[in-house]
Amino acid sequence: LAITIAPSFFLLSALFVILQYSYSLIFKHISVIDILAITTAYFLRVYAGEAAIGYHISIWLSLAAVSLALFLAIGKRRAELTLLGPTKKASPANTRDSLSHYSEKLLDTYTAMFANSTFLTYAFYTFLEKPINRGFLFTGYGELATAVSDRKWMMITIPFVLFGIMRYMQLIYEGKGESPEKLLTSDGSLLLTIIAWIGSVFFVIYGIGG
């Protein structure tokens, strides 16, 4: 089925399956490599989507995707350590080999680093990306349409990304970030933020054209 969509989509899907098996058998037991493997899995999904729909992802959006993937992967590990806090009976060494090599301070540093990286690369994307100019609201208004569509309207989506990062970090330290996929859709605040972000992106691209 995957190869009928696009050869590149099939290749990325195959790599994703191989990575998942490799992670389960090997990578999840090796510190740092486990985080990079989770990150690569997220990134393969992004590029599989690109291959499926034929949309070219710009360099800044790619960097934002990589940073977000690292942020989610590290958040997953940090949440696991939070659950294994001093009041818990289990210890990192008894749950997964790689966790025994992570300290809270190290993962806190990683989390802050890639939270900042995610925000900055996305902000640069909104500032530097060329307007798409598909808007319909000002069609037929000549110079006004050009002036409006030339604005960097994608910047209005930045607050949603900022809030999403801050809210996700809060949930990580509450020990709720073990499964990023479930958390992104089960937490009401995050879900509303994602919906608002998607809505604002569609409005900017297909409404204003910026």
Regions found by a protein language model. Give the residues of each.
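Intramembrane alpha-helical segments
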Residues: 1-53
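C-terminal membrane-associated helical module and adjoining short loops/tails
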Residues: 25, 43-210
